[in-house]
């Protein structure tokens, strides 16, 4: 009979490309900006995430809204003032000319690896 530790060892052999947990660091943590200003938010992954990154906007009392997927692809209906860029570990979201309706919480999500 195999012990759980031996079983885990077998499972890991089946997934040779398995990665460690990926830590995402977003900056700045908060910011103030004026209307019409260019704003950039960055997100850094602890390892290469192969551009599997989305950016979301959330307003108080509302569900998150996807703005960008695959690092730089704009979701249909999202204004063109939003853009995403980056590769490997470093990514950014830029709002070219800030509008009042852009006020909210922004965050990134990697989906190269799930917990």
From Swiss-Prot:
Gene3D superfamilies: Immunoglobulins
Region spans: Complementarity-determining-3: 109-115
Disulfide bridge positions per record: 43-108
Pfam families per record: V-set
Region (Framework-3): 77-108
Region: Complementarity-determining-1, residue numbers: 44-54
SMART domains cross-referenced by the UniProt entry: IG, IGv
PROSITE patterns: IG_LIKE (PS50835)
Annotated stretches, region: Framework-1: 21-43
Keyword Disulfide bond among record annotations: yes
Keywords from the named record: Adaptive immunity, Disulfide bond, Immunity, Immunoglobulin, Signal
Protein name as annotated: Ig kappa chain V-V region L6
Organism of this sequence: Mus musculus
């Amino acid at each position: 009979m195999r012990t759980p530790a031996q079983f885990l060892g077998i499972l890991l052999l089946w997934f040779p490309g398995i990665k460690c947990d990926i830590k995402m660091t977003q900056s700045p943590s908060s910011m103030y900006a004026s209307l019409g200003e260019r704003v950039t938010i960055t997100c850094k992954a602890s390892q290469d995430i192969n551009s599997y990154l989305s950016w979301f906007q959330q307003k108080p009392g509302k569900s998150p809204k996807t703005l960008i997927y695959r690092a730089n692809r704009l979701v249909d209906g999202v204004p063109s003032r939003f853009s995403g860029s980056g590769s490997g570990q470093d990514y950014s979201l830029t709002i070219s000319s800030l509008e009042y309706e852009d006020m909210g919480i922004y965050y990134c999500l990697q989906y190269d690896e799930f917990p």
